[in-house]
């Protein structure tokens, strides 16, 4: 029930906002040309009455019309919607001036400027009311949302819900150092007081698509990499494509998703069976990004929109400054960070994070049974800046603030929640394959297959996904691209006759020969391309190859090989540096229908803990070697402990389902 204190607090907030908005209008009247408030002779401030009336009516119209306009514009992507918020503000200001003509503007554009500046000022004041912390600002919104729910007599389940927060790309070892160094005080407090921190181990394909498919839907079988080729359909599947992700879900409808009952999916690649989705790639429709109503709810608050805009601008200038600093100090390894990347970074670290976090806040107040959210900012910046450099850790600190904010909301929610924090994979660092050896994996394969010199090898169509420099991360790129245009329906393969298709996912490469039927074995590959396998296995950037053979698949290394079925090693074991579970990972992938003709495991240098990605990324993931294969899991100490060791995304799914069923009435 609403207390007198709550009502008084809301009334004070309203009066402060109204009065400060009126004062802002008086100041703008004096410093801006093109805007004139009516004057009165009855007050010391002649323009005060007009300012009070204008501020009140503009605020009331904002409250009434803004949510409607945002829902109407939810059919466009959040980036374009973001621009639309400013146009909407101008329209509301024009309507205000028409209804209460207490001010005059010289030009139409002046009304848009006035609306934007007034909204910006009220955003600042709203934040000041709740102090300067994002947590306090969100808690102010929580009070308002909870008031509306209680006014509507909405009932909240009393059984504990489950909140899963994924920090994309954060490795176990990086997190432990961050906790020790004070980079993540929120997570540190969680681990030291109420939760436990453990590592888990990914499948061979250590990337978000494979992990989330396993964690959210219970199976990532037949997923060899972030992108792969289907010889039957001549189609390249890629996890940044909504149609492909939807197909992956349809293939798993026999398994109830983690979020199937009263669940919510926020910022993920997949729904997990949830019907309520915001920023979910598999539910993108044109540019709606799956659940337009979800992010339009966020933009329905003009203060939120302006807070996000200010932070995006700050993130853009921060990226430009940090990129120049890397070049000036000649910090290596590094990759180009121009083009659209600064905007993708701002989208991933600010816009996507703000929208997803705000949606989770709403979920917690409504009392949803299970919520899974992916915070992608660290992963995006780590790809281009490095896995533990100061600028990357600064982003991690901000995500820690988001986690703290959500924990604070949990404390305010009517329904109790158990909170789990996890990552989908880590990242490994190092100069790229192209930087080290002067050619891409695709160029190397074509050169060896055709016995041509490097200068004669041209860039081919199939390299555009795997080898183009300055490629943003999967999640950030996919979301941002869909914000301004409809995503493509996939890649259809049209390689020249006899030429291989080469795809890359971190330091995992996939080589297909479309002209060879089925899965080509060593004999077929050698007959079609003599010397290719020898050239690849002897290359310093290639750690091992997985290929089919008449007697069973084999792993080939520079000085030895492993029988996949029996595990028998001849010569030096090329998997020895990849960890004790490397053969099991390879064996599982070898059973997939769409495993590549040649699976290429990039070299891992244990002395420096580095890999050489087949993509232009400083921090990479997708294969084996280094911290990329060891993410983390933080869980409440009063829950049953997961298996130790915990191997594979499907095993994590089983653990989360068990915790979900303990916590909620499933």
Where are these predicted regions, by residue range?
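Active-site-proximal N-terminal segment of extracellular/periplasmic enzymes that hydrolyze or transfer
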Residues: 138-195, 436
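Short, structured active-site-proximal loop/turn typified by the sulfatase FGly-forming signature C/S-X-P-X-R
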Residues: 177-214, 218-223
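Beta-strand elements within well-structured catalytic alpha/beta cores of enzymes
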Residues: 156-176, 190, 215, 370-376, ...
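His/Asp/Glu-rich, glycine-adjacent segments
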Residues: 135-140, 218-386, 507-513, 517-519, ...
